[in-house]
């Protein structure tokens, strides 16, 4: 074989090797559970890094940056519909350099692109999908998009970039400048004071969106928003605002009684899809439960309602039984979905109940439970499945049943314990064992607040265990690991 032929053979083989290396999914060796969950997609995902950015610049391809987290229900829906589909993957791989980002691993990237998404669309959420120039400047953004519409978006944006590049660059520059202006807004110095009139004005503007009947903010999906509730509670005490105080009480009671509250294991789901706190998306996030410890602690001090105190113990029980690792640090989240061995997924299976199932487990107690937790049209979700949902107070229910509160609590605890035993036999949703320093710090604060309120050392001891582990494992030479 001549030297020229040998040269071309080696060149072609090496070129094909480089091409095959470039055209493959690169997530298998990542640490993030979320990224690993996408490692078998036909989409040629990169993790964020120089390799992906250089590939986009060298090929003059747009970046497609998809941001989510392992416990996000709609992230998994979009994966199943689009990212596991060969036709969609072909469009994505041909026209884009595709990057997967775990927002919990890279909150810096999540913050930057969320600002851009809100700037471009007026709202945000996850999964967050951004199409950007090879240098990372956004030109299109969206959240969950159904498969057919997703393909249309991909073709339209990539086609626009190829045929009207100057217009795309001009728009990208406007987005870049908008994000820069957002970044220029600096927080006020901590010692800066505001007039009473301004504080009242700002609080009342925020309060406009409160739902006085069902609690929470707005009339659609409901998120607990514990930091906002804490603000309203402090403001109502300082300025004797009874409307705000009543709103906080209503919200916390509705959350406690709602389907957003896991009455069996303790802990709260991230949000509900309705405005009455009934049907949750079933993921559980550490940062929500950590902050809910604080607001229920503060609320118990103000309202002296034992229901609020009981939620402190329920959250503690959840953290202890489901979220604590061997090193005493707290995991980040539990998925909304149950993953079965046959490859199928189903949202909420671990948490919901069928009426016939409850009848077999509870026997004579079924009627009691069906009235308390509304195993009827009020508590119905879908496919003969129910989400436990309380609509009257424990006191009202006791009066209706002709029992005292002590008898009631004893029976409820026995029934919940029985249901917990049965539920533990189910396939469990995936726990993301990622340790996030700031979320563990929030948990310490919530536990300390709970200790101050109850004087129960169980909360302080838990806080000290977490604090000691954080100090040993996540602080090195005064540098804090994220």
Task: Name each model feature, range by range.
Residues 1-22:
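Bacterial Sec-dependent N-terminal signal peptides
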Residues 5, 10, 243-251, 458-465:
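Short alpha-helical "patches" and their helix-cap loops
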Residues 323-332, 458-482:
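Catalytic cores of carbohydrate-active enzymes
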Residues 20-446, 450-454, 481-482:
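Replace the tail clause
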């Amino acid at each position: 074989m001549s030297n020229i032929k040998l040269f071309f053979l080696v060149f072609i083989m090496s070129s094909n090797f480089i091409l095959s290396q470039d055209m493959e999914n690169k997530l298998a060796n990542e640490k993030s559970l979320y990224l690993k969950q996408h490692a078998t997609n036909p989409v040629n995902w990169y993790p964020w890094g120089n390799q992906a950015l250089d590939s986009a610049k060298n090929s003059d391809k747009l970046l497609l940056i998809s941001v989510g987290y392992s416990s996000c229900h709609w992230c998994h829906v979009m994966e199943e519909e689009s990212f596991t589909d060969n036709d969609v993957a072909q469009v994505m791989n041909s026209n884009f350099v595709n990057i997967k980002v775990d927002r919990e691993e890279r909150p810096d990237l999540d913050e930057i692109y969320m600002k851009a998404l809100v700037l471009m669309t007026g709202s945000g959420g996850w999964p967050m999908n951004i199409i950007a120039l090879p240098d990372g400047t956004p030109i299109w953004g969206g959240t969950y998009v159904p498969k057919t519409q997703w393909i249309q978006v991909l073709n339209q944006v990539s086609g626009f970039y190829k045929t009207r590049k100057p217009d795309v660059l001009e728009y990208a520059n406007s987005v870049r400048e908008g994000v820069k202006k957002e970044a220029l807004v600096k927080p006020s110095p901590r010692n800066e004071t505001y007039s009473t009139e301004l504080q009242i004005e700002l609080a009342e503007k925020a309060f406009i969106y409160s739902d006085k009947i069902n609690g929470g903010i707005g009339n659609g999906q409901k998120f607990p928003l514990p930091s906002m509730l804490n603000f309203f509670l402090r403001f109502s005490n300082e300025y004797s605002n009874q409307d705000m105080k009543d709103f906080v009480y209503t919200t916390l009671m509705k959350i406690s009684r709602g389907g957003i509250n896991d009455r069996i294991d303790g802990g709260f789901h991230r949000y509900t899809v309705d405005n009455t706190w009934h049907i949750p998306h079933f993921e559980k996030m550490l940062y929500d439960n950590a902050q809910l410890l604080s607001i229920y602690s503060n609320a118990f001090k103000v309202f002296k309602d034992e229901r609020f105190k009981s939620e402190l113990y329920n959250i503690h029980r959840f953290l202890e039984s489901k979220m604590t690792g061997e090193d005493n640090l707290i995991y980040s989240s539990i998925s909304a979905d149950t993953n079965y061995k046959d490859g199928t997924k189903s949202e909420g299976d671990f948490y919901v109940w069928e009426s016939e199932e409850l009848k077999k487990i509870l026997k004579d107690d079924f009627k009691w439970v069906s009235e308390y937790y509304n195993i009827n049209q009020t508590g119905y979700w879908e496919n003969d499945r129910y989400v436990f949902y309380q609509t009257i107070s424990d006191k009202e229910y006791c009066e209706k049943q002709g029992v005292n509160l002590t008898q009631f609590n004893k029976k409820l605890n026995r029934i919940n314990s029985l249901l917990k035993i049965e539920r533990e036999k189910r396939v469990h949703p995936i726990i993301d064992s990622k340790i996030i320093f700031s979320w563990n710090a929030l948990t310490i604060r919530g536990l300390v607040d709970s200790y101050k309120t109850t004087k129960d050392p169980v909360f302080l001891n838990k806080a000290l265990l977490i604090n000691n582990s954080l100090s040993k494992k996540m602080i090195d030479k005064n540098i804090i690991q994220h």
